[in-house]
């Protein structure tokens, strides 16, 4: 089967128009054993204007949050919105599933990771698609260099799937939450993450960021986003969720989460809400351990489950389960929610009425891989009611998982009927999102466009939050002309190659800046920066300290280097202004800092926003979506 996509990008006064045309060529001998589908795009496509805010959005009370004028241009999109009336009937899907061998059905229920940035570089990818007929791919940073390369990789994989025995297109998924949780950073627009968007108080930004991100993802051939995070972050010291959440309020998470889901799915990218039944109140990172949520059933109902009920009502395509223990929902000691039939089937499928695809989180994570091993964990997850398991690791691990699932069905440990129901859900979604008609990449002109970057800049500026300023350092006073800037290596580099973008922007505005860049993963870097900072601090008017992952490192690694350095600087009597580049809960670990500015992430848009606030070109207008109670308050 050969798919040829012709795409054009037109500029109109109202914004962007993406025009897609699909030429589908298949010889009679190549006819795929799938139900015939109406072409996804007619010869005279009509465009659908996508507003920046969906019609049903409930805006906050007037005066409750700072506002900025919306300057993002309207978006017009053709041929990408989901067309549900072109999905084959259930009877037709049953016929298709009945014709599939068990091995192919199990393949469809697996989404896999792989090495390499081209099909020719990855024998694993070729085998997984052509031999095991896996249902989907999970793109990681190692697979993604830039939009052109990603699009080429996706097209190669989809063409291989079209030529394989199953001829079923692939889900191509990615973690593209926004902020610092993205897998493609070069060439795409870096939109602020969830907590930054919530800090603006503007749900329309959630819709716009998701809609524009979806346009960029689908242009690269990516059809599923493992987002949004719908965890209610009611523990400000949570080391794994933090800024990935919309905040501590279930109402706020529900409001902003709804707009995000709509933004993705109305622009042709399946959304996967996570981490069910809720990861926001934990104090352990599930990547390294097995957290426990010690809440009553009533508390879970009111807080953790509320955003997921919304997602079910809004028709989210997928929900990802979490690797954590919830005793109020599962009585078996130590059994994670992701392997609990009481949670996956009892609560999500039956009680909440979710009819979409249930995915596991990666089975290669910490306690799961160590406690069960991925093959056994996959069997337990499917027995619980999971439709798709996320495999992690080399080909040998993935094939062991595939073999374990096939054997479990053959032994009667998993019913054939359950497998068929899962595969029907998977195929239905692939039809609904037009993958059988066009799973390939499109026109990349929209990716990283000037219009999208302008929107990201506006959102980031509206998010910057001044938590407190007891020292009167924001904007920088006229007495602070010589700055010592301590920056994490995660900040974007300066265009001139000298230090970070932040230091360059401050210098461009007439400030004398010396910068020390620290790499928290390099002991030598940390020791050198610590010594140089303490020695040189007396020669500067102000120390600008850039916090990075303080919460995560303190919880996961007992790493208190940043707290120690801040304490030493304050003890010396120097003025210290802390920029919280990641989780605002970090402020609780250094409550003695008198001035704290919160950026929520280190995208270029967020760095530019912080610089504007520091030099007085803009006022900080964000509101912290968390409650932080400092000692003595």
Predicted regions, residues:
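A substrate-binding/cap region within the structured catalytic cores of diverse enzymes
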Residues: 194-222, 229-261, 265, 443-453, ...
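Second-shell residues forming the walls of enzyme active-site clefts
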Residues: 101, 121, 146-166, 180-182, ...
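Solvent-exposed loop/turn segments at secondary-structure junctions
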Residues: 115-119, 143-146, 176-181, 224, ...
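Hydrophobic faces of well-ordered beta-strands that scaffold small-molecule active sites
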Residues: 107-114, 135-139, 170-176, 224-228, ...
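Extracytoplasmic/periplasmic mature domains of Sec-exported, cell-envelope-associated bacterial proteins
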Residues: 86, 93-96, 100-103, 109, ...
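Active-site-adjacent structural elements in enzyme catalytic domains
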Residues: 144-170, 201-221, 417, 421-428, ...
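Preference for extracellular/luminal or secreted protein segments
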Residues: 1-45, 50-53, 59-60, 64, ...
């Amino acid at each position: 089967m050969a798919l040829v996509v012709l795409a054009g990008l037109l500029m109109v006064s109202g914004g962007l128009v993406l025009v897609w045309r699909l030429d589908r060529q298949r010889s009679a001998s190549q006819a795929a054993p799938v139900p015939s589908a109406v072409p996804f795009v007619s010869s005279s496509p009509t465009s659908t204007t996508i507003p920046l805010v969906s019609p049903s959005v409930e805006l906050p009370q007037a005066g409750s949050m700072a506002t900025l004028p919306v300057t993002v241009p309207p978006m017009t999109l053709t041929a990408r919105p989901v067309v549900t009336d072109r999905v084959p009937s259930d009877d037709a899907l049953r016929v298709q599933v009945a014709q599939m061998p068990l091995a192919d059905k199990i393949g469809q229920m697996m989404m896999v990771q792989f090495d390499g940035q081209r099909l020719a570089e990855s024998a694993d990818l070729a085998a997984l698609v052509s031999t095991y007929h896996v249902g989907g791919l999970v793109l990681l940073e190692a697979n993604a260099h830039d939009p052109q390369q990603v699009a080429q990789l996706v097209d190669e994989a989809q063409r291989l799937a079209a030529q394989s025995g199953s001829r079923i297109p692939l889900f191509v998924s990615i973690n593209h939450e926004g902020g610092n949780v993205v897998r493609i950073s070069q060439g795409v627009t870096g939109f602020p993450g969830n907590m930054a968007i919530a800090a603006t108080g503007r749900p329309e930004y959630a819709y716009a960021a998701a809609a524009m991100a979806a346009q960029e993802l689908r242009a690269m051939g990516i059809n599923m986003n493992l987002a949004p995070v719908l965890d209610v972050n009611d523990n400000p010291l949570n080391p794994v969720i933090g800024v990935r959440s919309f905040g501590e309020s279930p109402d706020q998470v529900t409001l902003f989460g709804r707009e995000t889901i709509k933004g993705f799915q109305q622009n042709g990218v399946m959304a996967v809400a996570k981490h069910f039944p809720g990861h926001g109140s934990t104090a352990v990172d599930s990547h390294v351990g097995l957290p426990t949520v010690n809440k009553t059933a009533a508390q879970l109902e009111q807080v953790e489950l509320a955003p997921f009920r919304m997602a079910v009502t809004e028709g989210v395509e997928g929900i990802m389960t979490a690797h954590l223990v919830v005793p109020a929902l599962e009585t078996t000691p130590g059994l994670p929610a992701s392997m609990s039939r009481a949670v996956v089937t009892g609560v999500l499928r039956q009680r909440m009425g979710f009819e979409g695809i249930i995915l596991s989180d990666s089975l290669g994570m910490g306690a799961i891989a160590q406690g069960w091993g991925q093959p056994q964990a996959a069997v337990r997850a499917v027995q619980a009611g999971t439709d798709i398991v996320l495999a992690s690791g080399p080909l040998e691990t993935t094939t062991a998982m595939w073999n374990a699932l096939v054997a479990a069905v053959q032994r009667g440990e998993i019913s054939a009927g359950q497998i068929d129901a899962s595969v029907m859900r998977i195929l239905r979604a692939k039809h609904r999102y037009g993958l059988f008609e066009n799973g390939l990449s499109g026109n990349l002109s929209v990716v990283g466009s000037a219009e999208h970057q302008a929107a990201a800049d506006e959102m980031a500026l509206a998010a910057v939050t001044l938590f407190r300023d007891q020292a009167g350092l924001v904007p920088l006073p006229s007495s602070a002309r010589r700055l010592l800037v301590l920056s994490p290596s995660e900040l974007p580099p300066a265009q001139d190659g000298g230090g970070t973008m932040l230091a360059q922007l401050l210098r461009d505005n007439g400030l004398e800046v010396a910068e020390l860049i620290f790499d928290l993963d390099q002991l030598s870097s940390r020791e050198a920066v610590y010594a140089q900072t303490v020695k040189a601090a007396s020669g500067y008017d102000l120390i600008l300290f850039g916090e990075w992952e303080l919460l995560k490192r303190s919880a996961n690694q007992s790493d208190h280097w940043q707290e120690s350095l801040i304490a030493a600087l304050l003890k010396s009597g120097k003025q210290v202004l802390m920029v919280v580049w990641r989780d605002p809960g970090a402020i609780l670990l250094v409550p003695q800092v008198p001035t704290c500015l919160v950026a929520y992430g280190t995208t270029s848009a967020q760095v530019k926003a912080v610089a504007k606030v520091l030099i007085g070109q803009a006022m900080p207008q964000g509101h912290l979506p968390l409650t932080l109670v400092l000692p003595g308050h």
